[in-house]
C-alpha cells in the first residue's frame, strides 16, 4: 500500500489535509469525511484544518454570525467521523481585533472575561469543540492567528480546556507552527509572522505603549469594524489626506509612502469611514495600549519639512528594522520591506 497525501479545499477557510492509504475496500457512510474513495476509511488518517472563524463576543458586529449553524454542523461531521484523527484550528478562532473603534474591547471586564463572553456568544460551537476534546477520538490543536495573537495559552484553555496548542514559545505566544504527528513535512500556521501589517512589532511605540507588540493591522481592523457599525457611502466617506513623496531617493521615505498608498487604497476603495480623522475614537486598553487614538495617529502625513512621518509605528520603515522584526517573529528567510508592505494588500 502506497502512502499518499491529499489536499482538498472544503470551504473558503477550511483546508483539510488527508493523509491516507490507498485501498479498494471502501466503507460507505453518510459522513462526508468517510466517503472519500481515495482513502482507507477503516482507520483514522485524516487531518482537517480550519481557520479564520472570527468568533467574536458581540453578534452586533462579529464577522461570523450568519453561518454559525453550518459551522456547528461541519464540526459535528468532523466529530462523528471514523476516519478523522485530528482537527487543527489554524488561527483567528477568537477575535480581539474586529471591535468598533468607540467600543471598550473588554467593557468593564478583563481579557479572560472577553474569552468567556466569546464562548457564551458562540456556545454551540464551543460545545462541539469541547466534546471533541472530551471524547478523545480526535486530537484538537489550536494555533494562534493575528486576530487572537494577544491571548495566552492559559486564556485559550479557559475556552478549550485540554486543547493542544502550538506556539513558538511562552514568550512568543502570538505565533506558532504545527507539524502533525508523523508528518514533519507538513507545516501548518496562520502566516501573520510574514505580514508587514500583522507580524508582532516589538518596541514600535515605546513612548505610547511600552512593551506592546500589536501591529498596524490591529488599528486597521478597529477602523474596519467601525465602518460596518457606522456605515457610509464611498462618495460621502472621509477622504485620506494627500501625502507627497518629496524625497524618493530616501529608502525609508519611499517605504513610508508605499505604506501610505496602501491605507489610501483601502480607505477609499474597500472600507468607507464616516468619521473625522482627527477625532480621538479608537479606544484601546488592549495589549498594553491605553490611549484613545485618532485615525490620523495611524496614517502617514507630511511634516513641516516635507518628510513623511507617522505618529505611531514611525520607526518601522527601514530594511534593517524589518529584518529585525522578521527575526523576532522567527522568520527563517528575510524579505524586502517594500515587497512585504505591498504584499499586505494582497493577503
What does each model-identified segment do?
Residues 16-19:
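C-terminal motif of bacterial Sec signal peptides marking the signal peptidase cleavage site
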Residues 22-347:
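Extended recognition/assembly regions associated with phosphoester-bond processing machinery
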Residues 1-2, 21-22:
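Generic cytosolic/nucleocytoplasmic N-terminal low-complexity/intrinsically disordered segments
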Residues 2-10:
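Sec-dependent signal peptide recognition
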